[in-house]
C-alpha cells in the first residue's frame, strides 16, 4: 500500500474510537504525523461533543480544502438511536450553523457504531452481538489497543468487500462509507 499524506482530522467521542480510527487509517496506508489532529471529548457526553463540534470542523475542512488535501473522519455512537437518526442530527447541526449538508464529493466520512464502538470490537473478536441490546457492550478501559488485531482484520475485509454477512448493520454501513470515500482520496 502506498503512503498517503493528507491533512486528517478525527472527531470522536472517546479514546477507544480514537485508537480504532488511527489504527484503521494506518493500516490503510495513511501517514499520521504532523498532518494529523484528533478532537476527542474531554469528559462528559461524547456524542453531544461530536454533534456540537461537527459543524465547526466541517467549516474548517471547507475553508482549507483548496489549500491542501484534507479529510474529516467522524465517529459517533448511535447509542439507542438508529444510524440514520444520528446522521440526521449531524445534518441538523450543519443546518443550524448555516452550512450546506455534506456533499458526496467531500472527503468527510462519518462512522456510526450502533450502541457503541465496542459492539464492533466484540463482533470482530468473534462474539455474537446484538445492536439492539438494552445495555451497551463493556468498554476496554485502559486497554483500548486490544482492538488493533481486529481492526487489521476489518481493514482487509472492508477493502476486499468481503465483510461477513452476519456483521452488524452499522459495521456494514461503515464499510460502505469507507468504499465511498477511498476513491476521493486517491
What does each model-found stretch correspond to?
Residues 10:
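Conserved SAM-binding loop
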Residues 47-49:
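Short glycine-rich substrate-engagement loop in P-loop NTPases that contacts/grips substrate
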Residues 1-7, 16-44, 54-186:
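C-terminal accessory helical subdomains adjacent to catalytic cores in phosphodiester-
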Residues 13:
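Phosphate-binding/switch region of NTP-binding enzymes
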Amino acid at each position: 500500500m502506498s503512503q498517503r499524506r493528507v491533512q486528517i482530522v478525527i472527531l470522536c467521542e472517546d479514546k477507544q474510537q480514537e485508537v480504532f480510527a488511527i489504527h484503521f487509517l494506518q493500516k490503510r496506508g495513511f501517514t499520521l504525523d504532523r498532518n494529523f489532529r484528533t478532537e476527542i471529548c474531554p469528559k462528559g457526553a461524547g456524542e453531544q461533543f461530536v454533534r456540537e463540534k461537527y459543524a465547526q470542523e466541517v467549516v474548517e475542512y471547507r475553508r482549507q480544502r483548496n489549500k491542501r488535501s484534507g479529510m474529516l473522519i467522524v465517529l459517533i455512537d448511535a447509542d439507542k438511536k438508529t444510524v440514520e437518526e444520528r446522521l440526521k442530527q449531524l445534518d441538523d447541526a450543519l443546518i443550524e450553523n448555516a452550512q450546506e449538508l455534506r456533499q458526496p464529493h467531500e472527503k468527510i466520512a462519518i462512522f456510526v457504531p450502533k450502541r457503541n464502538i465496542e459492539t464492533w470490537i466484540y463482533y470482530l473478536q468473534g462474539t455474537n452481538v446484538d445492536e439492539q441490546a438494552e445495555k451497551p457492550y463493556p468498554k476496554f478501559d485502559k486497554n483500548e489497543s486490544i482492538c488493533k488485531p481486529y481492526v487489521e482484520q476489518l481493514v482487509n475485509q472492508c477493502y476486499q468487500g468481503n465483510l461477513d454477512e452476519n456483521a452488524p448493520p452499522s459495521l456494514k454501513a461503515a464499510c460502505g462509507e469507507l468504499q465511498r470515500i477511498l476513491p476521493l482520496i486517491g
